[in-house]
């Protein structure tokens, strides 16, 4: 029982250290990639607006020609 507690404590300790290292790396990556994320988000918004505009034009054309 005592050895099991020691091994569980060791696993918990190592997991905590590894988690904190991952969080530090992620934080550094996020700082570098903020501009890149913003660009990707802007492009995805523009693509969505483009699709919306195409649908609007198609619907307007359909209503105008009465071929719906």
Swiss-Prot record:
Q: So which residues are the signal peptide here?
A: 1-22
| A single BP term in Gene Ontology | defense response to Gram-positive bacterium
Question: In which tissues is this gene expressed?
Answer: Expressed by the skin glands.
Keyword list, A-Z: Amphibian defense peptide, Antibiotic, Antimicrobial, Cleavage on pair of basic residues, Disulfide bond, Secreted, Signal
Instruction: Give me the disulphide-bonded residues.
Output: 62-68
| Domain of life assignment | Eukaryota
> Which residues would be cut away as propeptide?
23-39
Alphabetical list of Pfam families matching this protein? Antimicrobial_2, FSAP_sig_propep
Subcellular location per the Swiss-Prot or TrEMBL entry: Secreted
* Entry GO terms, CC: extracellular region
Q: What family, per the record?
A: Belongs to the frog skin active peptide (FSAP) family. Brevinin subfamily.
Q: What does this protein do?
A: Antimicrobial peptide.
Protein name, entry field: Palustrin-1c
List the taxonomic lineage.
Answer: Eukaryota, Metazoa, Chordata, Craniata, Vertebrata
